[in-house]
Amino acid sequence: MKRNKTSKAWMHEHLNDTYVQRANAEGYRARAAYKLMEIDERDRLLRPGRVVVDLGAAPGSWCQVARQRVGSDGRVLALDILPMDPVPGVDFLQGDFTEDAVLAELESRLAGAAVDLVLSDMAPNLSGVATVDQARSIYLCELALDFARRHLKPGGQFLVKVFQGEGFMGFRKAMDEVFLSVQVRKPKASRDRSAEVYLLGVDLR
């Protein structure tokens, strides 16, 4: 009974969420689009002609925003373990980012191109055990950071979703070693009660 009440409360909140309503009206696949838009409007990440890699891309709202903003001269490559309906102009790879073969395929599709911006909205499948889920989340962040370190061009940028908790400060320190500047972003579309924040690494060392 408690679970049913919780599910109904979540659905009521979801359907009445301003960002959900905007996403439906404006053709975006998820409210997360507005998180990226707000950060981009502040930090100018998605410039015309840029090469962008979107990790944890499904259902595709960040791809939609990135594709619109980098323009016809830009390029967007996306990856997710889940399937994703095609986004016009986006090269999508379905696979598990923790697997070497999937990483190799993603790198093959880059074909040696230097990347301007790596986005990571990855999150693990939740087990319900907070310590386990947090450790898995930080691990995905570390993998994304390693990818960014190896593929960003000098001066490149990295935006990653991180959940505050065990391992957060250690990951923040790791980003400080890779980027000249690391900033915390908490967009308005991110629910206040959520432990998620976004770390923005600017200017790859």
From Swiss-Prot:
It catalyses: uridine(2552) in 23S rRNA + S-adenosyl-L-methionine = 2'-O-methyluridine(2552) in 23S rRNA + S-adenosyl-L-homocysteine + H(+). It comes from the Bacteria. The active site is at K161. GO terms for molecular function: rRNA (uridine-2'-O-)-methyltransferase activity. Keywords: Cytoplasm, Methyltransferase, rRNA processing, S-adenosyl-L-methionine, Transferase. It is an enzyme of class 2 (transferase). PANTHER family: RIBOSOMAL RNA METHYLTRANSFERASE (PTHR10920), RRNA METHYLTRANSFERASE 2, MITOCHONDRIAL (PTHR10920:SF18). Specifically methylates the uridine in position 2552 of 23S rRNA at the 2'-O position of the ribose in the fully assembled 50S ribosomal subunit. Belongs to the class I-like SAM-binding methyltransferase superfamily. RNA methyltransferase RlmE family. This is Ribosomal RNA large subunit methyltransferase E. It comes from Azoarcus sp. (strain BH72). The gene is rlmE.
